[in-house]
Amino acid sequence: MSSGRKSLSIGIVTLLLAATLISPAWAQDQAEPLVIITQIDTSQFPSVTVYISVTDEAGEPVGIDPSRLLIQENGVTIQPDQMQGNAAVIDSLTTMLVMDVSGSMYSANKLDTAKEAAKAYVDQMRPGDQTGLMSFNTEITYAQPLTADVDQLKTAIDSLVADKDTAMYDALVEATDVLDPVPGRKAIIVLTDGMDNVSQNDLGNVIARIGPSGLSISTIGLGNPEDQSATLAGIDEPALIELANRAGGEYAYANDPAGLTRLYQRYARVMQSEYAITYTSPGELRDGLTRQLTVSLAETNATTEAAAYNPGGLVPEVGDPASWSMFLTALAVLLALLFVPAVIGRLVSQASSAKLPSPRKRKPKIKFKDKQV
Protein backbone atom coordinates (compact mmCIF):
# COMPACT_ATOMS: atom_id res chain seq x y z
CA MET A 1 0.00 0.00 0.00
CA SER A 2 1.44 3.37 -0.96
CA SER A 3 2.05 5.99 1.71
CA GLY A 4 -0.66 8.18 0.15
CA ARG A 5 -3.34 5.50 0.39
CA LYS A 6 -2.20 4.59 3.91
CA SER A 7 -2.49 8.19 5.04
CA LEU A 8 -5.95 8.45 3.46
CA SER A 9 -7.12 5.28 5.24
CA ILE A 10 -5.84 6.53 8.59
CA GLY A 11 -7.59 9.85 8.01
CA ILE A 12 -10.91 8.16 7.23
CA VAL A 13 -10.66 5.94 10.33
CA THR A 14 -9.85 8.97 12.47
CA LEU A 15 -12.88 10.87 11.14
CA LEU A 16 -15.16 7.88 11.75
CA LEU A 17 -13.92 7.53 15.33
CA ALA A 18 -14.38 11.24 15.95
CA ALA A 19 -17.89 11.13 14.53
CA THR A 20 -18.70 8.13 16.74
CA LEU A 21 -17.52 9.95 19.85
CA ILE A 22 -19.13 13.28 19.02
CA SER A 23 -22.48 12.04 17.69
CA PRO A 24 -23.96 10.78 20.99
CA ALA A 25 -23.15 14.03 22.77
CA TRP A 26 -24.50 16.09 19.88
CA ALA A 27 -27.64 13.98 19.68
CA GLN A 28 -28.14 14.26 23.43
CA ASP A 29 -27.96 18.06 23.24
CA GLN A 30 -30.43 18.06 20.36
CA ALA A 31 -32.80 15.68 22.11
CA GLU A 32 -33.19 17.60 25.37
CA PRO A 33 -36.92 17.65 26.15
CA LEU A 34 -38.87 20.86 26.52
CA VAL A 35 -40.43 21.38 29.96
CA ILE A 36 -43.41 23.77 30.20
CA ILE A 37 -45.58 24.78 33.17
CA THR A 38 -49.07 24.69 31.67
CA GLN A 39 -51.26 25.36 34.72
CA ILE A 40 -50.89 26.35 38.39
CA ASP A 41 -53.90 25.47 40.54
CA THR A 42 -53.98 27.43 43.82
CA SER A 43 -57.69 26.95 44.52
CA GLN A 44 -56.83 24.73 47.54
CA PHE A 45 -53.94 26.90 48.76
CA PRO A 46 -51.60 26.31 50.58
CA SER A 47 -51.88 23.09 48.57
CA VAL A 48 -50.64 23.90 45.05
CA THR A 49 -50.88 21.68 41.97
CA VAL A 50 -48.54 22.34 39.06
CA TYR A 51 -49.25 20.77 35.66
CA ILE A 52 -46.20 20.22 33.46
CA SER A 53 -45.79 19.08 29.87
CA VAL A 54 -42.59 17.40 28.68
CA THR A 55 -42.19 17.23 24.90
CA ASP A 56 -39.57 16.54 22.26
CA GLU A 57 -38.49 18.79 19.40
CA ALA A 58 -41.52 17.75 17.36
CA GLY A 59 -43.87 18.71 20.18
CA GLU A 60 -44.74 15.11 21.01
CA PRO A 61 -45.03 14.02 24.67
CA VAL A 62 -41.99 12.40 26.28
CA GLY A 63 -42.35 9.78 29.01
CA ILE A 64 -40.10 10.33 32.03
CA ASP A 65 -39.93 9.33 35.67
CA PRO A 66 -41.92 12.12 37.43
CA SER A 67 -39.39 12.13 40.28
CA ARG A 68 -36.92 13.73 37.83
CA LEU A 69 -39.02 16.91 37.82
CA LEU A 70 -37.46 19.34 40.29
CA ILE A 71 -39.60 22.23 41.57
CA GLN A 72 -38.50 25.29 43.50
CA GLU A 73 -40.69 28.02 44.99
CA ASN A 74 -38.85 31.27 45.69
CA GLY A 75 -35.61 29.30 45.57
CA VAL A 76 -36.75 26.64 48.06
CA THR A 77 -36.66 23.07 46.74
CA ILE A 78 -40.10 21.45 47.05
CA GLN A 79 -40.86 17.97 48.34
CA PRO A 80 -44.06 16.90 46.51
CA ASP A 81 -47.03 15.52 48.42
CA GLN A 82 -48.33 13.75 45.31
CA MET A 83 -47.15 13.12 41.75
CA GLN A 84 -49.21 12.05 38.75
CA GLY A 85 -48.14 11.27 35.23
CA ASN A 86 -46.46 8.52 33.25
CA ALA A 87 -47.81 5.38 34.97
CA ALA A 88 -50.26 7.35 37.17
CA VAL A 89 -52.23 9.11 34.43
CA ILE A 90 -53.92 12.43 35.26
CA ASP A 91 -57.55 11.63 36.05
CA SER A 92 -59.46 13.94 33.73
CA LEU A 93 -59.08 16.76 31.24
CA THR A 94 -61.62 19.52 30.61
CA THR A 95 -61.34 21.37 27.30
CA MET A 96 -63.23 24.27 25.79
CA LEU A 97 -62.96 24.37 22.00
CA VAL A 98 -63.31 28.01 20.92
CA MET A 99 -63.84 28.30 17.17
CA ASP A 100 -63.87 31.26 14.79
CA VAL A 101 -67.09 31.32 12.71
CA SER A 102 -66.61 34.79 11.22
CA GLY A 103 -67.40 35.39 7.56
CA SER A 104 -63.81 34.74 6.44
CA MET A 105 -64.11 31.12 7.62
CA TYR A 106 -66.60 30.53 4.81
CA SER A 107 -63.91 30.94 2.14
CA ALA A 108 -61.78 28.02 0.93
CA ASN A 109 -63.87 25.58 3.01
CA LYS A 110 -62.02 26.70 6.14
CA LEU A 111 -64.96 26.08 8.45
CA ASP A 112 -65.51 22.55 7.12
CA THR A 113 -61.80 21.87 7.65
CA ALA A 114 -62.01 23.20 11.20
CA LYS A 115 -65.08 21.08 11.95
CA GLU A 116 -63.37 17.85 10.91
CA ALA A 117 -60.27 18.69 12.96
CA ALA A 118 -62.35 19.52 16.04
CA LYS A 119 -64.20 16.21 15.72
CA ALA A 120 -60.84 14.41 15.52
CA TYR A 121 -59.94 16.04 18.85
CA VAL A 122 -63.23 14.88 20.38
CA ASP A 123 -62.53 11.32 19.21
CA GLN A 124 -59.46 11.25 21.47
CA MET A 125 -61.41 11.95 24.66
CA ARG A 126 -60.87 9.40 27.44
CA PRO A 127 -63.36 8.24 30.05
CA GLY A 128 -63.65 11.09 32.55
CA ASP A 129 -62.72 13.80 30.03
CA GLN A 130 -65.23 16.47 29.07
CA THR A 131 -65.30 19.06 26.31
CA GLY A 132 -67.41 22.10 25.48
CA LEU A 133 -67.82 24.18 22.33
CA MET A 134 -67.95 27.96 22.02
CA SER A 135 -68.09 29.78 18.69
CA PHE A 136 -67.54 33.44 17.95
CA ASN A 137 -68.03 36.02 15.26
CA THR A 138 -69.59 39.35 16.25
CA GLU A 139 -71.48 37.37 18.88
CA ILE A 140 -70.40 34.58 21.25
CA THR A 141 -72.42 31.36 21.21
CA TYR A 142 -72.06 28.64 23.83
CA ALA A 143 -72.86 25.96 21.27
CA GLN A 144 -72.33 22.97 23.57
CA PRO A 145 -71.93 22.98 27.37
CA LEU A 146 -69.27 20.73 28.84
CA THR A 147 -70.08 17.08 28.24
CA ALA A 148 -68.50 13.64 27.90
CA ASP A 149 -70.95 12.74 25.10
CA VAL A 150 -68.90 12.54 21.90
CA ASP A 151 -71.91 12.31 19.58
CA GLN A 152 -73.50 15.37 21.16
CA LEU A 153 -70.29 17.32 20.67
CA LYS A 154 -70.02 16.31 17.02
CA THR A 155 -73.60 17.39 16.38
CA ALA A 156 -72.84 20.80 17.88
CA ILE A 157 -69.68 21.13 15.79
CA ASP A 158 -71.55 20.30 12.58
CA SER A 159 -74.14 23.00 13.36
CA LEU A 160 -71.66 25.89 13.13
CA VAL A 161 -72.24 28.49 10.40
CA ALA A 162 -69.83 31.24 9.28
CA ASP A 163 -70.92 34.90 9.27
CA LYS A 164 -69.99 38.45 10.40
CA ASP A 165 -66.79 39.74 12.10
CA THR A 166 -64.31 38.45 14.70
CA ALA A 167 -64.56 38.89 18.51
CA MET A 168 -61.99 36.38 19.70
CA TYR A 169 -61.01 38.06 22.98
CA ASP A 170 -64.64 38.42 24.07
CA ALA A 171 -65.13 34.70 23.46
CA LEU A 172 -62.01 33.83 25.46
CA VAL A 173 -63.22 35.90 28.42
CA GLU A 174 -66.51 33.99 28.33
CA ALA A 175 -64.69 30.66 28.07
CA THR A 176 -62.46 31.39 31.07
CA ASP A 177 -65.53 32.33 33.12
CA VAL A 178 -67.20 29.02 32.24
CA LEU A 179 -64.12 26.99 33.17
CA ASP A 180 -63.27 28.91 36.35
CA PRO A 181 -65.27 26.71 38.79
CA VAL A 182 -64.21 23.45 37.11
CA PRO A 183 -61.57 21.54 39.13
CA GLY A 184 -58.51 19.75 37.74
CA ARG A 185 -56.64 20.15 34.46
CA LYS A 186 -58.46 22.39 32.02
CA ALA A 187 -57.56 24.09 28.78
CA ILE A 188 -58.87 26.27 25.99
CA ILE A 189 -57.98 25.62 22.36
CA VAL A 190 -58.88 28.56 20.14
CA LEU A 191 -58.83 28.48 16.34
CA THR A 192 -59.00 31.56 14.14
CA ASP A 193 -58.16 32.55 10.59
CA GLY A 194 -57.99 36.29 11.05
CA MET A 195 -57.66 39.27 13.35
CA ASP A 196 -59.91 40.34 16.20
CA ASN A 197 -61.70 43.49 15.06
CA VAL A 198 -64.79 43.95 17.27
CA SER A 199 -63.98 42.70 20.80
CA GLN A 200 -64.62 44.86 23.83
CA ASN A 201 -61.82 42.96 25.61
CA ASP A 202 -58.13 42.52 24.83
CA LEU A 203 -55.35 40.07 25.62
CA GLY A 204 -54.73 41.64 29.03
CA ASN A 205 -58.37 41.15 30.02
CA VAL A 206 -58.17 37.47 29.07
CA ILE A 207 -55.03 36.85 31.15
CA ALA A 208 -56.49 38.74 34.12
CA ARG A 209 -59.64 36.59 33.97
CA ILE A 210 -57.73 33.34 34.56
CA GLY A 211 -58.63 32.58 38.16
CA PRO A 212 -56.72 30.87 40.98
CA SER A 213 -57.47 27.41 39.58
CA GLY A 214 -55.65 28.41 36.41
CA LEU A 215 -55.93 27.05 32.88
CA SER A 216 -53.92 27.06 29.67
CA ILE A 217 -54.81 28.58 26.30
CA SER A 218 -53.39 27.09 23.11
CA THR A 219 -53.91 28.87 19.80
CA ILE A 220 -54.18 27.68 16.21
CA GLY A 221 -53.91 29.90 13.17
CA LEU A 222 -55.64 28.61 10.05
CA GLY A 223 -54.20 29.85 6.78
CA ASN A 224 -50.86 31.23 5.65
CA PRO A 225 -49.34 33.57 8.27
CA GLU A 226 -46.99 35.06 5.68
CA ASP A 227 -49.86 36.32 3.53
CA GLN A 228 -50.96 39.63 5.07
CA SER A 229 -52.00 41.15 1.74
CA ALA A 230 -55.55 39.84 1.93
CA THR A 231 -57.69 40.77 4.93
CA LEU A 232 -59.47 37.42 4.96
CA ALA A 233 -56.26 35.40 4.73
CA GLY A 234 -54.02 37.24 7.22
CA ILE A 235 -53.45 35.76 10.69
CA ASP A 236 -52.54 37.96 13.63
CA GLU A 237 -49.68 35.62 14.44
CA PRO A 238 -47.87 37.84 17.01
CA ALA A 239 -51.05 38.13 19.08
CA LEU A 240 -51.70 34.38 18.96
CA ILE A 241 -48.10 33.61 19.97
CA GLU A 242 -48.17 36.07 22.88
CA LEU A 243 -51.51 34.74 24.08
CA ALA A 244 -50.26 31.14 24.11
CA ASN A 245 -46.96 32.04 25.78
CA ARG A 246 -48.62 34.03 28.56
CA ALA A 247 -51.31 31.41 29.18
CA GLY A 248 -49.12 28.30 29.36
CA GLY A 249 -50.17 27.00 25.96
CA GLU A 250 -48.72 26.51 22.51
CA TYR A 251 -49.16 28.27 19.18
CA ALA A 252 -49.13 26.53 15.81
CA TYR A 253 -50.64 27.11 12.38
CA ALA A 254 -51.93 24.91 9.61
CA ASN A 255 -52.45 25.50 5.90
CA ASP A 256 -54.38 22.35 5.02
CA PRO A 257 -56.99 19.97 6.49
CA ALA A 258 -54.53 17.18 7.30
CA GLY A 259 -52.17 19.55 9.09
CA LEU A 260 -54.99 21.05 11.15
CA THR A 261 -56.26 17.62 12.20
CA ARG A 262 -52.76 16.59 13.25
CA LEU A 263 -52.46 19.73 15.39
CA TYR A 264 -55.67 19.05 17.30
CA GLN A 265 -54.68 15.43 17.83
CA ARG A 266 -51.20 16.40 19.05
CA TYR A 267 -52.62 18.96 21.49
CA ALA A 268 -54.81 16.20 22.93
CA ARG A 269 -51.89 13.76 23.26
CA VAL A 270 -49.68 16.31 25.00
CA MET A 271 -52.29 17.38 27.56
CA GLN A 272 -53.30 13.80 28.31
CA SER A 273 -49.63 12.96 28.95
CA GLU A 274 -48.84 15.81 31.34
CA TYR A 275 -47.49 15.50 34.86
CA ALA A 276 -49.22 16.89 37.95
CA ILE A 277 -47.23 17.66 41.08
CA THR A 278 -49.05 18.68 44.26
CA TYR A 279 -47.15 20.25 47.15
CA THR A 280 -47.67 22.46 50.19
CA SER A 281 -46.35 25.99 49.72
CA PRO A 282 -43.54 26.97 52.13
CA GLY A 283 -45.38 30.27 52.62
CA GLU A 284 -48.73 28.97 53.80
CA LEU A 285 -50.51 32.34 54.20
CA ARG A 286 -52.57 34.14 51.57
CA ASP A 287 -50.45 37.24 51.95
CA GLY A 288 -50.98 38.65 48.46
CA LEU A 289 -47.31 38.14 47.56
CA THR A 290 -46.26 36.64 44.23
CA ARG A 291 -44.37 33.34 44.35
CA GLN A 292 -41.78 32.43 41.72
CA LEU A 293 -41.80 28.82 40.49
CA THR A 294 -39.10 27.02 38.53
CA VAL A 295 -39.21 23.50 37.12
CA SER A 296 -36.21 21.64 35.74
CA LEU A 297 -35.49 18.10 34.63
CA ALA A 298 -32.78 16.29 36.60
CA GLU A 299 -29.85 14.70 34.78
CA THR A 300 -30.29 16.83 31.66
CA ASN A 301 -29.32 20.22 30.32
CA ALA A 302 -32.94 21.07 29.58
CA THR A 303 -33.86 24.73 30.00
CA THR A 304 -35.44 25.57 33.35
CA GLU A 305 -39.06 26.67 33.02
CA ALA A 306 -40.19 29.61 35.16
CA ALA A 307 -43.64 30.86 36.13
CA ALA A 308 -45.29 32.79 38.93
CA TYR A 309 -48.50 32.73 40.94
CA ASN A 310 -50.18 34.84 43.59
CA PRO A 311 -52.35 33.13 46.23
CA GLY A 312 -54.38 36.31 46.68
CA GLY A 313 -55.58 37.80 49.93
CA LEU A 314 -56.78 41.41 50.16
CA VAL A 315 -56.25 41.27 53.96
CA PRO A 316 -53.07 39.31 54.79
CA GLU A 317 -53.73 36.18 56.80
CA VAL A 318 -52.30 35.84 60.31
CA GLY A 319 -50.64 32.55 61.18
CA ASP A 320 -50.85 32.80 65.00
CA PRO A 321 -54.42 33.29 66.32
CA ALA A 322 -52.98 35.08 69.36
CA SER A 323 -51.73 37.80 67.02
CA TRP A 324 -55.31 38.88 66.36
CA SER A 325 -55.54 40.44 69.84
CA MET A 326 -52.43 42.48 69.10
CA PHE A 327 -53.86 43.49 65.74
CA LEU A 328 -57.20 44.58 67.25
CA THR A 329 -55.44 46.51 70.04
CA ALA A 330 -53.30 48.36 67.52
CA LEU A 331 -56.39 49.08 65.43
CA ALA A 332 -58.21 50.49 68.50
CA VAL A 333 -55.26 52.77 69.28
CA LEU A 334 -55.18 54.07 65.72
CA LEU A 335 -58.90 54.76 65.76
CA ALA A 336 -58.54 56.58 69.08
CA LEU A 337 -55.75 58.75 67.71
CA LEU A 338 -57.95 59.54 64.73
CA PHE A 339 -61.19 60.42 66.53
CA VAL A 340 -60.13 61.73 69.99
CA PRO A 341 -58.77 65.08 68.71
CA ALA A 342 -62.01 65.69 66.86
CA VAL A 343 -64.10 64.90 69.95
CA ILE A 344 -61.95 67.14 72.19
CA GLY A 345 -62.18 69.96 69.70
CA ARG A 346 -65.95 69.71 69.62
CA LEU A 347 -66.21 69.73 73.47
CA VAL A 348 -63.97 72.80 73.71
CA SER A 349 -66.07 74.56 71.11
CA GLN A 350 -69.27 73.80 73.00
CA ALA A 351 -67.78 75.02 76.32
CA SER A 352 -66.66 78.28 74.75
CA SER A 353 -70.08 78.85 73.29
CA ALA A 354 -71.73 78.35 76.72
CA LYS A 355 -69.67 81.17 78.35
CA LEU A 356 -70.60 83.82 75.81
CA PRO A 357 -73.80 85.87 76.48
CA SER A 358 -76.49 84.95 74.15
CA PRO A 359 -77.34 87.80 71.79
CA ARG A 360 -80.71 89.54 72.18
CA LYS A 361 -83.17 88.64 69.62
CA ARG A 362 -84.37 91.69 67.78
CA LYS A 363 -87.99 91.91 66.95
CA PRO A 364 -88.50 92.12 63.27
CA LYS A 365 -89.52 95.50 61.94
CA ILE A 366 -92.77 95.45 60.06
CA LYS A 367 -93.36 98.13 57.50
CA PHE A 368 -96.92 98.94 56.56
CA LYS A 369 -97.92 100.72 53.45
CA ASP A 370 -99.84 104.04 54.08
CA LYS A 371 -103.41 103.92 53.07
CA GLN A 372 -104.32 106.44 50.49
CA VAL A 373 -107.59 108.37 51.10
Which residues make up each language-model segment?
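Exposed acidic/Ser/Thr-rich ligand/metal-binding surfaces
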Residues: 93, 108-113, 119, 123, ...
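Bacterial N-terminal signal peptides that target proteins for export
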Residues: 1-12
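C-terminal "exit" segments of structured domains
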Residues: 41-46, 245, 255-352
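Extracytoplasmic
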Residues: 45-49, 64-66, 90-96, 116-117, ...
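Cytoplasmic C-terminal tails of single-pass
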Residues: 350-373
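Bacterial N-terminal signal peptides
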Residues: 11-20
